[in-house]
């Protein structure tokens, strides 16, 4: 559960597999402060999503490219998938390895935990890189390159080196763990519904609490 002491009025409430997950006003305030400070310093975009990939915060430093992409229902669905699977990976690996989203941009995720429950994930990124070692999170990429508007917006995206990207992931994780310490030993089993087979086949999930949840 994510209750701690006297609960203030729930701001973000969502039910997963019978479990009620609540971000209190104080939780949400801290999460937004983390994202604001991180994006102000790095100029990298960030949002907070729940355990279903649903966005629960304002968009911090969002690129025009991604704003247009997420207004397309088909694209937005794949964005949510990337957010969710990126969060799963970050949780099971206990690290925040960057990945390529379905549009080819570099993103990374840091889990937010409280009292052994995962409240959600801070998703950050929306950058380009020439580094070819960062792999896609989904098995197929979205074919968007015939869209003239998206091509023009893509050219305006920031380009980071691999070192800059990995430094950003480290900074965000340090910020998050200062306010929301990550305790793997007491991590609650995440009550996910059945996920697509490729999540297991492409990236074997070894953490028992995630495997049981699937």
Where are these regions (language model features)?
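A broad, low-specificity signal marking well-ordered, structured residues that form hydrophobic/aromatic
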Residues: 8, 97, 122
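A short, hydrophobic, proline-anchored segment that marks a local hinge/packing element in signaling
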Residues: 107-115, 124-127
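Structured interaction and signal-relay segments at domain junctions
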Residues: 18-104
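Juxtadomain coupling helices with adjacent low-complexity linkers
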Residues: 21-40, 120-211
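Short, Lys/Arg-enriched N-terminal segments with co-localized hydrophobic residues
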Residues: 1-20
